[in-house]
Amino acid sequence: MSHLVKMENGQSQTIQEMLGCIERYNPDHLKTLESYVQDQAKNNTYDLEANLAVLKLYQFNPHMLNFDITYTILLKSLTSLPHTDFVMAKCLLLPQQMKDENVQTIIDLADILERADFTLFWQRAEVNRNMFRHIAGFHDSIRKFVSHVVGTTFQTIRKDLLKELLGGIEDSTLESWIKRNGWKNQGQGLVIVAMQDDKIKTKNITEKIEFDNVGALMAQCL
């Protein structure tokens, strides 16, 4: 769905065009931006700049604060991990937003993800599942982040552990994630995450330094 913003001169701009000018601070556009946030949740799309603009408008206009939109923005920013979108969004929160119980729950979930305690995350996610039920693709976005961490941490991993880290998924779904990430089943309940040839190898670098380049420096040391 295309979102157009109506200007005072009667003309319309796209949200991206509006965000590139002073109109991004016009509270008259907040409802359109909030609708855009809801569409992102529904359609599994993401626009960080627009979402941060909403939080900034809340700062300037606290009486227009919408907590449901705040939750959606924060949860959508979690789907972009390992990027720092959540930190940027959190920095724009008002004191009343920070005191909100649901906001604190989302912040706790973010902390758990950042320290890679994925088993605990899925437990907390199950308890709070209604909070992000409306966000399409939320679980798979988190699994993509989990896969990123696994890929940078393990060479091989037990299949049962991988299944647990990905949220206790079905065996068929696990096989799909293994294939998606280019991993290999080794047998005996193990998954090869990184081949030996993919490991970082040391390399000796020889740099030729001409005497003229250091002559002046050596002269100063005499």
UniProtKB/Swiss-Prot annotation:
UniProt keyword annotations, A-Z: Cytoplasm, Initiation factor, Protein biosynthesis
Pfam families xrefs: CSN8_PSD8_EIF3K
GO molecular function term, any single one: RNA binding
InterPro entries referenced in this protein's UniProt entry, alphabetically: ARM-type_fold, CSN8_PSD8_EIF3K, eIF3k, PCI_dom, Transl_init_fac_sub12_N_euk, WH-like_DNA-bd_sf, WH_DNA-bd_sf
Signal peptide: none
Keyword hit for Cytoplasm: yes
PROSITE patterns xref list: PCI
Function: Component of the eukaryotic translation initiation factor 3 (eIF-3) complex, which is involved in protein synthesis of a specialized repertoire of mRNAs and, together with other initiation factors, stimulates binding of mRNA and methionyl-tRNAi to the 40S ribosome. The eIF-3 complex specifically targets and initiates translation of a subset of mRNAs involved in cell proliferation.
Family: Belongs to the eIF-3 subunit K family.
PANTHER family attached to this UniProt entry: EUKARYOTIC TRANSLATION INITIATION FACTOR 3 SUBUNIT 11, EUKARYOTIC TRANSLATION INITIATION FACTOR 3 SUBUNIT K
Subunit structure: Component of the eukaryotic translation initiation factor 3 (eIF-3) complex. The eIF-3 complex interacts with pix.
Protein name: Eukaryotic translation initiation factor 3 subunit K
Organism expressing this protein natively: Drosophila sechellia
Taxonomic lineage from the root: Eukaryota, Metazoa, Ecdysozoa, Arthropoda, Hexapoda
